[in-house]
Amino acid sequence: MSARLKEKYVSEITPALVEKFSYSSVMQTPKIEKIVLNMGVGDAVSNAKNLDEAVEELGLISGQKPLVTKAKKSIATFRLREGMSIGAKVTLRGDRMYEFLDKLINVSLPRVRDFHGVSSRAFDGRGNYTLGVREQLIFPEINFDNVNRVRGLDIVIVTTANTDEESRELLTQFGMPFAH
């Protein structure tokens, strides 16, 4: 049983993109390569328990075990030493990636307060899209009662598109609600 969005990509989105950008081959159509979820937990320096909670929440959201990220350099003003654990990240690929995107677009984003669509200016010039989420409570897996602190996370959607225009069209076809 492959993911719903993956089937939609193969049957509907690919032909639409080939027609719009007049690719000579179906293999030229941009596709989503991976989705990276990153949660920076700066306060883990003073309280390591915060990092454990963030790792657990990220695991619930993504459905796989997060990787704990460590500080590359020491920064005295932040009381940070090199090698200290200061965040967590997850890289989603394949069916899990499509299922997460489906859940993000259809369930989580509509739950954001005062939501008018995601910014269309968050492309990086290489066809990748970055989205910041202010609170982890928009995800259905997170139980409101078990949350001690509201944390945000970054969601990076890496595509094989060469331009931002192609990438935006790809994400629009998937149903990403861009603010005009």
Swiss-Prot record:
Q: Which UniProt keywords apply?
A: Ribonucleoprotein, Ribosomal protein, RNA-binding, rRNA-binding, tRNA-binding
Per the record, the GO terms for biological process are: translation
Q: Which InterPro entries would you find in this protein's record?
A: Ribosomal_uL5, Ribosomal_uL5_bac-type, Ribosomal_uL5_C, Ribosomal_uL5_CS, Ribosomal_uL5_dom_sf, Ribosomal_uL5_N
Q: Name one GO cellular component term.
A: ribonucleoprotein complex
Q: Name one GO molecular function term.
A: tRNA binding
Read off the Pfam families from this record. Ribosomal_L5, Ribosomal_L5_C
Similarity remark: Belongs to the universal ribosomal protein uL5 family.
* Function text: This is one of the proteins that bind and probably mediate the attachment of the 5S RNA into the large ribosomal subunit, where it forms part of the central protuberance. In the 70S ribosome it contacts protein S13 of the 30S subunit (bridge B1b), connecting the 2 subunits; this bridge is implicated in subunit movement. Contacts the P site tRNA; the 5S rRNA and some of its associated proteins might help stabilize positioning of ribosome-bound tRNAs.
Supply the PANTHER family for this chain.
60S RIBOSOMAL PROTEIN L11-RELATED (PTHR11994)
Please describe the quaternary structure of this protein. Part of the 50S ribosomal subunit; part of the 5S rRNA/L5/L18/L25 subcomplex. Contacts the 5S rRNA and the P site tRNA. Forms a bridge to the 30S subunit in the 70S ribosome.
Protein name, UniProt field:
Large ribosomal subunit protein uL5
What is the organism of origin for this protein? Levilactobacillus brevis (strain ATCC 367 / BCRC 12310 / CIP 105137 / JCM 1170 / LMG 11437 / NCIMB 947 / NCTC 947) (Lactobacillus brevis)
Encoding gene, per UniProt annotation: rplE
